[in-house]
Structure formats: structure tokens, C-alpha cells
């Protein structure tokens, strides 16, 4: 049961009332690299994506780097990377070859990137961010809110949003091999022509230290995460839509159009990674092969645990373990128990 709760979708198995957290020693510094690079043509755009993929494979595919790089607005590469275990000078040195390559070419517009390092123990201190990096986080403005309540400013748009489409895929590290990079680059560019693509490097475990790989291997998650250098997320939505929510509006035509483009973008990306797994918590509500996508070879064991601890099917989750035995609303058993 403990194994199943670690990645199997906890709500499918019971109610967790208490847990113990494992803590880890902090490095001296955490830090971030921010920037945007826009290409002037399709040819320059593909060259930029190719250069970044090669740079990532040789310089960032390690335990120091994570978070995201996004392909957005057709021809813009947005950098939102974080690092740990490096100081600011080391982080700047790591990126210097890539930034020099961009600066040498007139087909790219590029504002100077921001590279910052902060003491790791201040990473959750909102007052530190307000003083040293204003705008990076936003304070909770509700009356009476605790002074330690803050959130990443870029996440603010998710409050109350209505999701039109949400797709994810684990991208295998083999795509970073020199002979496979062209396939990956073509797929990324084709997908980004349809919709923005975010590569979440911290959510792929390949390149992590052995201890982290071993700990992840001892979970119910799709084992594909162990060999993934990134989780690709292609998603979009709009403002509040449910009745009673402030400012609720419904634009069904726009929502369906967005959903179609999001699916098309993921279809294009999956040409480089057919049958890629997906992350349970950030994935397609309509995932057709959800058992394999979410859990791979672990699903059979999860199903046996579900049958043992919840034979009556009290706990039902859409596309959760054992949900194929029930109607879509979870109230009618459609397969014998």
C-alpha cells in the first residue's frame, strides 16, 4: 500500500491522515536563469532550437539544473531555469557558450539574461524576494492573509482558470544523443507551430544522482520517468467558466479550437517519442491509454493492491487504478468485483 501511494494516485486507495516527510540537506545556493530569445525566421528558429538541445545535452543534463524552457509564440525560446549547488559565477560560466552563440548572430533578438543566486535558506522567504527580486513572487493580498503567503507571479493566472486542453509526455534521454537530436528538434518545432511547448527538466529524472534514481525506481510511477530528460507539457485554458465564479464567461468555440490545436501539437511532438508515458497529475483528461501512460509496467501490481485494500471500490478516481471496472461517474460497477 505504501508503494502504491507513492505515485499510484493516492485517492484511489484510501484517505491518508498522517505522513512523515523525508528532508534533505540544502546546498549553499539556489539560483535561476531567465531570458527570452526570438528568431527572425523559421530557419533561424530551427537553428536556435537545435543549438539549445545540443547545449542542454552537454552542459545542463546533470544534477545542477532543472525547471523549464518554453517554445512560445511561434519563434521565441523562453528560459526559466533554476540551479542548485552552483554559485552565480559558475552558473554564468555554464551558460556563456550558448549566450555567446546567440549574440554572434543578427537573426536573434535577445535581451540580456538575468542570472541570480541566493542563499538556499532564503528560497522560501517572501520578504527576501520582495527586497532582492521584486516581481518574482506576489504576496497574498487577501485581508488578514499570513505574511508568509506568496506565490510565483507567473502562476497567478492559474487561479480559477478553465482548462481547454492539457497534454504531457515523458521525453526519453535517448533523444539527446547526437544522432537523434534532429528528430527531436523537428518534432519540437512542429509542435510549437501549433501551440506553446514547455519542457520541464526537473520532472524528468534522467541525469539525476544514483540515490534519486533509486528512490524514484521504488515508486509506482511509470518507469519511463527514470529515462526521461524532461516532461513536455502542452496546455492552455481560459478564465473562470463555472456559474457563480467571479467573471465567469463561456466561449465554447474558442475552447474547442484551443483543445484541437493542443492535441495537434502533442501529436507532432510524439512523432519523436511514440507511446510516451504521461504524468498522472498533469495530463489529458481524455487519455485513451491511461493505464500504460501513467504507470507502464507497474499497473498490474497496482491493480492487485487496489483489489486487496478496496475490494468494494469505495474510492473512485477518473482514470485512477481500478476505474475501468466502473461507469464514468464511478457509481455503477460494469465489471464483476
Predicted regions and their residues:
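Soluble FAD-dependent oxygen oxidases
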Residues: 1-337
Amino acid at each position: 500500500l505504501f508503494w502504491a501511494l507513492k505515485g499510484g494516485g493516492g485517492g484511489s486507495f484510501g484517505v491518508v491522515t498522517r505522513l512523515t516527510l523525508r528532508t534533505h540537506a540544502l546546498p549553499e545556493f539556489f539560483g535561476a536563469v531567465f531570458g527570452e530569445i526570438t528568431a527572425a525566421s523559421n530557419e533561424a528558429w530551427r537553428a536556435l532550437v537545435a543549438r539549445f538541445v545540443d547545449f542542454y545535452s552537454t552542459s545542463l543534463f546533470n544534477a545542477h539544473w532543472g525547471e523549464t524552457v518554453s517554445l512560445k509564440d511561434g519563434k521565441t525560446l523562453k528560459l526559466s531555469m533554476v540551479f542548485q549547488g552552483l554559485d552565480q559565477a559558475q552558473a554564468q560560466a555554464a551558460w556563456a557558450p550558448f549566450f555567446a552563440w546567440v549574440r554572434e548572430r543578427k537573426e536573434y533578438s535577445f535581451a540580456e539574461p538575468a542570472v541570480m543566486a541566493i542563499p538556499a535558506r532564503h528560497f522560501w522567504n517572501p520578504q527576501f524576494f520582495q527586497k532582492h527580486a521584486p516581481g518574482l513572487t506576489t504576496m497574498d493580498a487577501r485581508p488578514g492573509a499570513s505574511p508568509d503567503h506568496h506565490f510565483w507571479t507567473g502562476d497567478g493566472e492559474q487561479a480559477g482558470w478553465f482548462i481547454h486542453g492539457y497534454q504531457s509526455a515523458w521525453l526519453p534521454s535517448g533523444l539527446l544523443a547526437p544522432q537523434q537530436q534532429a528528430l527531436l528538434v523537428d518534432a519540437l518545432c512542429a509542435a510549437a507551430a501549433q501551440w506553446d511547448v514547455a519542457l520541464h527538466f526537473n520532472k524528468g529524472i534522467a541525469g539525476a544522482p544514483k540515490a534519486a534514481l533509486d528512490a524514484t525506481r521504488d515508486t509506482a510511477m511509470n518507469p519511463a520517468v527514470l529515462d526521461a530528460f524532461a516532461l513536455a507539457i502542452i496546455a492552455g485554458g481560459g478564465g473562470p467558466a463555472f456559474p457563480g465564479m467571479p467573471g465567469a464567461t463561456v466561449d465554447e468555440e474558442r475552447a474547442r479550437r484551443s483543445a484541437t490545436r493542443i492535441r495537434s501539437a502533442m501529436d507532432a511532438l510524439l512523432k519523436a517519442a511514440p507511446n510516451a508515458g504521461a504524468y498522472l497529475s498533469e495530463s489529458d483528461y481524455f487519455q485513451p491509454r491511461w493505464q500504460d501512460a501513467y504507470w507502464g509496467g507497474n499497473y498490474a501490481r497496482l491493480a492487485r493492491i487496489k483489489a486487496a485494500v478496496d475490494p468494494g471500490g469505495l474510492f473512485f478516481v477518473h482514470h485512477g487504478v481500478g476505474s475501468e471496472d466502473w461507469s464514468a461517474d464511478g457509481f455503477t460497477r460494469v465489471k464483476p468485483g
